[in-house]
Amino acid sequence: MNAAEQFRPLLSETAFSTWVACFGPWIGSDWKNVSLHQAGAFFRKQLLTKPAHAHKADDEGPAWQQGARSGWLLLRGPSSEFWFDKWLAHLCSRGVQFHWQEKLHEFAYDGAKITGARLTSGLRIEADVHVLAINPFYAAEILERTPELAKLDQLCRFRALVQDGPHVQVSFRIAFAQRIRWPRPRCALVVADSEFNLTLFAEEQVWAPDVELGEGIASLWTGTSCVSSVPGQLYGLPVARCTESQFIEEIKAQLLRCGALDALIREANAGRTLATFQIEHIEVWHEWKFSPDGIQGRQPKWVNTTHTQRWQPTQATPVPNLILAGAHTRTDADVWSLEAAVESGWRAARMIEPEVRVLPQYRPAWLRLLGAFDDFLYRLGAPHVLVVVPSAVVVGLVIVAGVLLLSHQRA
């Protein structure tokens, strides 16, 4: 069931648009495709997480606590320099070899195990265990090049898994020559009235003072458009059909049109409006190729939808030395997320090293009981537990009131 459509009859037009605007920035998906299961599971995890976890101080920073509603966790600089480069150096120091600018083409399968993997360059890779941890759109193509593999249990799920296509989530940056201040720390924004479901964050709020924003740049906003099928007001075109210049003009128009955003800017900048701050440059992430025939990205992004949830494969496959990993595989996290990706990696590692421990997702006892009851109702074809329980409570109160009234009359 589509989450947005399930809530539409219950909300006003303004409340509905505000509610679904949270789906892109928070859940990381297009609100037109988000299932009720995915939305419910995501927000439940945000509200009902375990008690706060204390992180000890180390050479990277002071001690801090992570818990429900802690806010966005952010790096203190650009992702490559402050995260990926450090991990790359660490893995190389441990003996990991990377083959850059190479693509996996197919697996060699002898009917019992994987005997090797061939790259598009022709290079053959041999290993005791092969872990397929790439996005499922490419994985589906790779597996289909070896029909004997593609028809096996779990591996045969990939074509159905990607049936809804990728989620188009376009990243962009807006640079200003003057510093734009915000009324509170770590002010992250969802532009709820934007057709493209825009979300924004000003990086200078958290980046270290010695990190360069760019020559002559005092404020650097990073943003994302999360919905690709809703037409913008300026050109009447959705993201999927815009040219790059049209996309940029739509972004500017939607931001300048947002009264709530402008009110925040005026509050923190002595009454100055957003329009008075000159934009020096707007840059769209280089991997996106715009075309009237449809936008395409080099790394198609998979997310849960109303059609794909049940097709998620397990990490284990019928081939003993082929393991799957990624947020598109089945996990206890149960929704496409960084947490699911990490968990899938632990589960894949445990298949190689059985002593690896996979931490279960936290679910309170009352929620587990409620979920089991709802599963029972589903098997019976009965309404959702949130419909049945309130109805049962009302009926129970009526019965109790009737019994009390009858007892009073007899007395």
Where are these regions (language model features)?
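C-terminal segments that line or cap access tunnels to active or ligand-binding sites in enzymes
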Residues: A54-L75, A127-V129, I134-E343
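C-terminal lid/capping helical subdomain adjacent to the catalytic/cofactor pocket in oxidative enzymes
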Residues: K301-A411
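Conserved beta-strand-loop-beta-strand element in the redox core of flavoprotein oxidoreductases
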Residues: F107-I125
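Rossmann-like nucleotide/phosphate-binding core characteristic of flavoprotein oxidoreductases
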Residues: M1-W26, E249, A253-Q278, G294, ...
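Acidic/histidine-rich catalytic neighborhood
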Residues: L123, Y138-A140, A160-L161, Y378-V385
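Amphipathic alpha-helical segments that form well-ordered structural scaffolds
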Residues: Q6, F82-S93, Q246-C258, S344-M351
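Active-site/ligand-binding neighborhood in enzyme catalytic cores
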Residues: M1-D110
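Short, hydrophobic alpha-helical segments
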Residues: R94, E126-V131, A349-R357
